[in-house]
């Protein structure tokens, strides 16, 4: 962060807050290499035709200074000598430069907004993606309806650039960014297909994710404005939104649009209890009130995406379900609200009568079928469940093979320990345990039974089931009833920053 600040202040003193000159600075690409962002493009690859090194970056910067090579039209982009024969190579280099440069001011803005160390400490546990589940356990039992929404895509790259312009004021920088996108994303029509976006996101992951996150942030900022206008209660907690250029003008225009189109509905659309949760491209909207108000939110979202972001979205893609009757998927878990009925006998004077008590509880379940599909895709078993070995690991030592399987089992157990039903998790552990035994038997060219009898590895493989209990026993006494109760109840770990590779959240 300090390096960012030094380099940006040096450029500000010369160019008055413009980002465009930073594209031609070699230290920008040095930062990308030294900080080891997603994937480094500056290490030499012997198996490739191009040598990824800082020397090539320096030559690229020199050629970018030649303005006659940058005058490119959409029709002759493939013939321009600037890009040469290796288009993907230049795409990676320039994309990395754009991503680093455009992230600098927002890193500085975020760091300046969190000046006190206590503020950072207080939000430390909230970095975990599992910190959302205690919130859901506390709030969702009082709600009745839930809407499972997937943020629509693909969005045209021009819309992404226009959204970014509200944050950064630098016309030459965006001119060069458009030039880059025109030449590397086949930006020939306003209709953007999923295949073209997928190709661009794979070849330029950091830049694409940065632009996509701005799209989501813009959508959520408008949603936050609508939520505050439609609720009697003030919002107590919200994410930090950076100040943007022309935001207030856009907001006034948005008020005029909604006042004109929804003048009869906005006046009584008051939802005092509504909760919104998002992870990546999926969001969940839950409310206590009638489905009529949820339908209003549904149409607001559709009009917002189609009229403001020019993204096609159909009403049938947004489902509104009753929490007590339907489950929804979030972060690899299945969630639903279970209604428990209990009968209490009460007596008053000479009369006795029965009282029915209904209580709600949020069930968080491991999705066993999607997990088995993920294990089958990773070649641990087939889709029906029978075990197969991992022959690609047969060249490793026995200790390395066992350690690999234990690490996978440990990560899954760590991730899914918040489940209210642990039997499904034990089935996954059992599949991994037998797959490990079968891989070891395949390596030694023996049957599973003969291998276990000869090597006595059965006791060693018990770690698949006992490791989690040993960790809990370090915290609680072994002879206490607390340990047995924790094995059955949910335990959320607040150190999980991303979902497991085997988690299927489709």
Curated annotation (Swiss-Prot):
Superkingdom, taxonomy of origin: Eukaryota
Disulfide bonds: none
Gene Ontology CC terms: chloroplast
Key words, A-Z: Chloroplast, mRNA processing, Plastid, RNA-binding, tRNA processing
Entry keyword annotation includes RNA-binding: yes
Signal peptide annotation: none
Biological processes per GO annotation: mRNA processing; RNA splicing; tRNA processing
PANTHER family named in the record: MATURASE K
Family: Belongs to the intron maturase 2 family. MatK subfamily.
Name of the molecule in the record: Maturase K
Lineage: Eukaryota, Viridiplantae, Streptophyta, Embryophyta, Tracheophyta
């Amino acid at each position: 962060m300090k390096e960012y600040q030094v380099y940006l202040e040096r450029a500000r003193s010369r160019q008055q807050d413009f980002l465009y000159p930073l594209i031609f600075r070699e230290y920008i690409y040095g930062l990308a290499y030294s900080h080891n962002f997603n994937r480094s493009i500056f290490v030499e690859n012997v198996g490739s035709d191009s040598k990824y090194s800082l020397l090539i970056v320096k030559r690229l910067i020199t050629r970018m200074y030649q303005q006659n090579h940058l005058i490119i039209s959409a029709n002759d982009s493939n013939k321009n000598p600037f890009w040469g024969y290796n288009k993907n190579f230049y795409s990676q280099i320039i994309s990395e430069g754009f991503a680093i440069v455009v992230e600098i001011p927002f890193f500085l803005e975020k760091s300046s907004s969190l000046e006190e160390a206590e503020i950072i400490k207080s939000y430390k546990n909230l970095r975990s993606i599992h910190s959302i589940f205690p919130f859901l356990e506390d709030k969702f039992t009082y709600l009745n309806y839930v809407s499972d929404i997937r943020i629509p895509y693909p969005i045209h790259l021009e819309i992404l650039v226009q959204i970014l312009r509200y944050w950064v004021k630098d016309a030459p920088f965006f001119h060069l960014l458009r030039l880059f996108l025109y030449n590397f994303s086949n930006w020939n029509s306003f209709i953007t297909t999923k295949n073209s976006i997928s190709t661009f996101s794979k070849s330029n992951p950091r830049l694409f994710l940065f632009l996509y996150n701005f799209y989501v942030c813009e959508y959520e900022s408008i949603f936050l404005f609508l939520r505050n206008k439609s609720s009697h209660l003030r919002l107590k907690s919200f994410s930090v939104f950076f100040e943007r250029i022309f935001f207030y003008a856009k907001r006034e225009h948005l008020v005029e649009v909604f006042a004109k189109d929804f003048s009869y509905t906005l006046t009584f659309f008051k939802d005092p209890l509504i909760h919104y949760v998002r992870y990546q491209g999926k969001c969940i909207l839950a409310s206590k009130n009638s489905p009529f108000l949820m339908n209003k939110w549904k149409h607001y979202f559709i009009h917002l995406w189609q009229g403001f972001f020019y993204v096609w979205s159909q009403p049938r893609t947004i489902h509104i379900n009753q929490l007590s009757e339907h489950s929804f998927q979030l972060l690899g878990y299945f969630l639903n609200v279970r209604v428990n009925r209990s009968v209490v006998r009460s007596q008053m004077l000479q009369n006795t009568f029965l009282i029915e008590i209904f209580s709600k509880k949020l069930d968080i379940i491991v999705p066993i079928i999607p997990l088995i599909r993920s294990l089958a895709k990773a070649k641990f078993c087939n889709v029906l469940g029978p075990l197969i070995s991992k022959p690609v690991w047969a060249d490793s030592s026995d200790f390395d093979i066992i350690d690999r399987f234990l690490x996978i089992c440990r990560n899954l157990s760590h991730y899914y320990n918040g489940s209210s039903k642990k039997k499904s998790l034990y089935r996954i552990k059992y599949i991994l345990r037998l797959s490990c035994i079968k891989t070891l038997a395949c390596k030694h060219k023996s049957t599973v039974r003969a291998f276990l009898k000869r090597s006595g590895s059965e006791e060693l493989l018990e770690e698949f089931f006992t490791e989690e209990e040993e960790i809990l026993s370090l915290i609680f006494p072994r002879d206490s009833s607390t340990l047995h109760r924790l094995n059955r109840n949910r335990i959320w770990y607040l150190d999980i920053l991303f979902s497991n590779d085997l988690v299927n959240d489709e």
